[in-house]
Swiss-Prot record:
Modified residues (Phosphothreonine): 12
Occurrences of domain Globin (ranges): 2-146
Family: Belongs to the globin family.
Organism the protein comes from: Piliocolobus badius
Name of the featured protein: Hemoglobin subunit beta
Description of how the protein assembles with itself and partners: Heterotetramer of two alpha chains and two beta chains.
Binding residues for heme b: 63, 92
Origin superkingdom: Eukaryota
């Protein structure tokens, strides 16, 4: 991902304030609510029958935290996203058979959740920088798909 120094600083500064536990669970939960077909990848998570069930589900929260942990690793390696996400790309492609379009959806949901949490601090410039990052991460996660 090519970010200007200002964009990189904006992404890093905001990410330092992110509560990964809270934002991760909320982002994954919103993905599962807004795009219910994504729930099929999470059969083992138990009750996902309503928005409240999804948002209160401890397995959704735990996996959301794990997802944002991986995203944090990506932020530390913006110059090598494909390498950073190579194993996760293989896992999601070969074993989990996740449609790579879902990575784009989750990235967009994450941007919305960040905007909700940070309000005026999430300026159009910060949003534009995060859109570049989530697009780069989605592309890296889709890299191993044939």
């Amino acid at each position: 991902v090519h970010l200007t120094p200002d964009e990189k600083n904006a992404v890093t500064a905001l990410w330092g304030k992110v509560n990964v536990d809270e934002v991760g669970g909320e982002a994954l939960g919103r993905l599962l609510v807004v795009y219910p077909w994504t729930q099929r990848f999470f059969d083992s998570f138990g009750d996902l029958s309503t928005a409240d069930a999804v948002m209160g589900n401890p397995k959704v929260k735990a996996h959301g935290k794990k997802v944002l942990g991986a995203f944090s690793d990506g932020l530390a390696h913006l110059d090598n996203l494909k390498g950073t996400f190579a194993q996760l790309s293989e896992l999601h492609c070969d074993k989990l058979h996740v449609d790579p379009e879902n990575f784009k959806l989750l990235g967009n949901v994450l941007v919305c959740v960040l905007a909700h949490h940070f309000g005026k601090e999430f300026t159009p410039q910060v949003q534009a920088a995060y859109q570049k990052v989530v697009a780069g991460v989605a592309n890296a996660l889709a890299h191993k798909y044939h």
